[in-house]
């Protein structure tokens, strides 16, 4: 909003299909921001899922380039994204590619209504709301997206963390959230107390927080560009 000539936005791509398949615009960014303060807007785009999970990303897509479906949608309209590229000259077509991401198609009526509630122009391209990876929403644990959003709600706390964390059930059946500090000497009892208070204030009082120095974090992320960091412990861990 400060610079009419420049937009810093997110996009969504799939390695097998292409980059920038879904993308933010000024209008979708304004809509997503407004969802944080307008529950009615969040429920319009997400249904009851708005109060259970992190706010989804709101993306546009080019219907002349991609055909998007949602497989097995739930009561709120969220299901697995399925994308077909419409390029007739593609070397490998890969029709109806299921991405493993949770998404919801937004109708033109919902788009116009949401834009009006957010005080912005209605995007002229169709919208899809994306909630993150399906595998990152294990039963009995918070979603990875909700933990990321929780940590970045407080910029001062987020500045002390690397962004790597691990969710797991502990021996007593509780939920353990293990976090990696971003530098040596940061993992103090005071920061842990801040984190626990932060979790409680934002509806995650059940989390048992453990804070690690960078080199002591057992699942320390390596510079492996072939694999994504595993935020959720496997059942056998």
Where do the language-model regions lie?
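Active-site glycine/GP-rich loop and adjacent strand/helix microenvironment
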Residues: 1-237
